[in-house]
């Protein structure tokens, strides 16, 4: 039986995540890329900028009304924080049936939107047409903390290091290779957006300290957890293994994972479980690609889930 193709448009397609989204859409047998919006690349052929796409489609500079008028089955918003609202409002008014997936932080605290971290929130999906994609750091933190959430004796402390692609394409100190050379940049050391996001989602306070490093892509998240009672390494390892046994994108490893081994891959590695003397403090490390599981891959999981398809279609 042939499944009818769905049309999809991407807004903010020039960025690193937009490029990864185009690759995933090109690999998806049931999706047709109907438009891509980029102010900077308007008029240029998509195929000239993305080897994965074969076709004549050109980038367009579309405002919110023009995006809504396209009436695509799916629209993915890959815009900087604070820019999604006009597009959402226009689609709500003109094409409310459109599935909207927003990759910014704009709707992550809105209870009317489904918060799409499938490995943790899949069971709460109930047909919502508005999906908020989690943050990249926030994804790594939640997947690391969740298996021990009921054992916490205090706020988890999360030390995150990201490649500079996480700072986007707009020039800044945090994506300037010259300034990052032989350097690590701490920033937003309290009250980071992802700190608030994880605290809200897990229902416990979380302390997060982000840093940018000279590599291009990939996140290392080192999480320090204080426990209510002593646990052995085997007990902790079993919690992770059991929690994610049926999750093909999450791999539990023995040693602390390296970010160089996850770059360009769709999944998450969690490991390096290390106990302090007394067995009431444990450190766990997670790695993921911030552009993939931290953004584009997760958006595709959410899209597939919402449309009733295999969640890993185009990802496997």
Curated annotation (Swiss-Prot):
Quote the cellular component terms of the Gene Ontology held in the record: cytoplasm
Annotated pathway: Amino-acid biosynthesis; L-arginine biosynthesis; N(2)-acetyl-L-ornithine from L-glutamate: step 3/4
* Subcellular location per the Swiss-Prot or TrEMBL entry: Cytoplasm
Positions annotated as active site in the UniProt record: 136
Check the record and name the Pfam families matching this protein: Semialdhyde_dh, Semialdhyde_dhC_1
Which GO biological process categories is it annotated with? L-arginine biosynthetic process
GO MF, one annotated term: NAD binding
Keyword Ubl conjugation on entry:
no
Provide the E.C. number(s) assigned to this enzyme: 1.2.1.38
Record field: catalytic activity: N-acetyl-L-glutamate 5-semialdehyde + phosphate + NADP(+) = N-acetyl-L-glutamyl 5-phosphate + NADPH + H(+)
Q: Which UniProt keywords apply?
A: Amino-acid biosynthesis, Arginine biosynthesis, Cytoplasm, NADP, Oxidoreductase
Gene3D superfamilies, per this entry? Dihydrodipicolinate Reductase, domain 2, NAD(P)-binding Rossmann-like Domain
Q: Which CDD domains match?
A: AGPR_C_ARG5_6_like (cd23936), AGPR_N_ARG5_6_like (cd24149)
What is the annotated role of this protein in its UniProt record? Catalyzes the NADPH-dependent reduction of N-acetyl-5-glutamyl phosphate to yield N-acetyl-L-glutamate 5-semialdehyde.
Q: Matching PANTHER family, A to Z?
A: N-ACETYL-GAMMA-GLUTAMYL-PHOSPHATE REDUCTASE, CHLOROPLASTIC-RELATED, N-ACETYL-GAMMA-GLUTAMYL-PHOSPHATE REDUCTASE, CHLOROPLASTIC-RELATED-RELATED
Q: Which family does it belong to?
A: Belongs to the NAGSA dehydrogenase family. Type 1 subfamily.
Q: What is this protein identified as?
A: N-acetyl-gamma-glutamyl-phosphate reductase
Q: Tell me what organism the protein belongs to.
A: Xanthomonas euvesicatoria pv. vesicatoria (strain 85-10) (Xanthomonas campestris pv. vesicatoria)
What lineage does the source organism belong to?
Bacteria, Pseudomonadati, Pseudomonadota, Gammaproteobacteria, Lysobacterales
Protein's gene = argC
């Amino acid at each position: 039986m042939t499944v009818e193709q769905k049309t999809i448009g991407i807004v903010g397609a020039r960025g690193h995540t937009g490029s990864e989204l185009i690759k995933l859409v090109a690999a998806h047998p049931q999706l047709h890329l109907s438009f891509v919006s980029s102010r900077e690349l308007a008029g240029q052929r998509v195929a000239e900028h993305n080897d994965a796409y074969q076709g004549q489609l050109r980038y367009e500079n579309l405002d919110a009304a023009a995006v809504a008028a396209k009436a695509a089955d799916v629209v993915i918003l890959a815009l900087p924080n604070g820019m999604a609202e006009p597009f959402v409002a226009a689609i709500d008014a003109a094409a409310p049936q459109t599935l909207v997936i927003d990759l910014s932080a704009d709707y992550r605290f809105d209870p009317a939107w489904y918060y799409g971290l499938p490995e943790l929130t899949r069971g709460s999906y109930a047909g919502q047409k508005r999906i908020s994609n989690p943050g990249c750091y926030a994804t790594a933190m939640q997947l690391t903390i969740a298996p021990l959430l009921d054992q916490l004796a205090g706020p988890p402390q999360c030390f995150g290091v990201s490649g500079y692609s996480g700072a986007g394409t707009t020039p800044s100190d945090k994506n300037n290779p010259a300034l990052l050379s032989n350097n690590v940049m701490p920033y937003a050391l309290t009250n980071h957006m992802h700190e608030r996001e994880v605290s809200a989602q897990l229902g416990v306070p979380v302390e997060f300290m982000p840093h940018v490093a000279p590599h291009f892509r990939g996140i290392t998240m080192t999480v320090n957890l204080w426990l209510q009672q002593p646990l052995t390494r085997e007990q902790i390892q079993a919690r992770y293994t059991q929690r994610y046994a049926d999750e093909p994108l999450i791999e539990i490893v023995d040693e602390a994972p390296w970010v160089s081994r996850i770059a360009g891959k769709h999944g998450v590695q969690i490991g390096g479980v290390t106990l302090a003397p007394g067995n009431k403090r444990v450190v766990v490390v997670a790695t993921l690609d911030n552009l993939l599981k931290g953004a584009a891959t997760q958006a595709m999981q959410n899209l597939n889930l919402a449309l009733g398809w295999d969640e890993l279609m185009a990802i496997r």
